[in-house]
Amino acid sequence: MRIALGLEYDGSNFSGWQSQKGVRTVQATLEQALSAVANEPVTVITAGRTDAGVHAAAQVVHFDTATFRLEHNWVFGGNANLLPEVAILWAQPVNEAFHARFSAIARHYRYIILNRGARPAIANRRVTWYCQPLSVTKMKEAGAFLVGEHDFSSFRAKACQAKSPVRNVHYLEVTRQGDWIVIDISANAFLHHMVRNIAGVLMAIGKGEQPPRWAEEVLQARCRAVGGVTARPDGLYLVRVDYPDHFDLPRLSRPVTVW
């Protein structure tokens, strides 16, 4: 049978999602916990592979198993075997047509910036701190150039393995609440480092280093070298993955906040 899971994790102390020898990863941690519940080896497929230090409030995975367990047994049993930084939120049997990655129709990320003079303590490694003033007005103006279907070569990592750099950004919003600046972005899919590179460009514009139209110039250049610095992973969260309604999967009631 095929089981879908929703989970959240604090990525601060993980070397990313994907299993790698000799380092702690979210995938390996989850597979070890689920294997203990299933009494057999379990391999999970994820909706999106997050980088080292990146967090998730609503990651989705699936796995195949010959072991029958009630839904709450996968949740409680899995969580009993997981590290505190990872939690299974829900479990649901799905038909074999469901695929956590390929069935997804949209992914939503949130990038959180603490924009104040003093560094964070409680939110350390869970937000990106920037001490100089940032103009949300300029960041909003710049973000509008990136909405729609474009070649995002300037925003992909050098090691990105995606066959095509074309992605469709459904929306990109920048908001401020007190000292907090939030970048919300949704697309059909994302390239490696795409959100962090977009955040880096918007922050450079917010600082006043570049005008808002620079975002369009970077996009049109189709060259990573012109795109400036990749933003830190600390403030990045995967907050939702959308699937066609007929799969009838649970959804979080609200995205992550830290205020």
Swiss-Prot record:
Catalytic class of the enzyme: isomerase
Biological process annotations from GO: tRNA pseudouridine synthesis
InterPro entries: PsdUridine_synth_cat_dom_sf (IPR020103), PsdUridine_synth_TruA (IPR001406), PsdUridine_synth_TruA_a/b_dom (IPR020097), PsdUridine_synth_TruA_C (IPR020095), TruA/RsuA/RluB/E/F_N (IPR020094)
EC numbers: 5.4.99.12
Domain of life: Bacteria
Pfam families for the chain: PseudoU_synth_1
Presence of keyword Transcription regulation: no
Catalyses which reaction(s): uridine(38/39/40) in tRNA = pseudouridine(38/39/40) in tRNA
Annotated transmembrane regions: none
Active site: 51
Subunit structure: Homodimer.
Similarity field: Belongs to the tRNA pseudouridine synthase TruA family.
Protein name, UniProt field: tRNA pseudouridine synthase A
Organism: Nitrosococcus oceani (strain ATCC 19707 / BCRC 17464 / JCM 30415 / NCIMB 11848 / C-107)
Name of encoding gene: truA
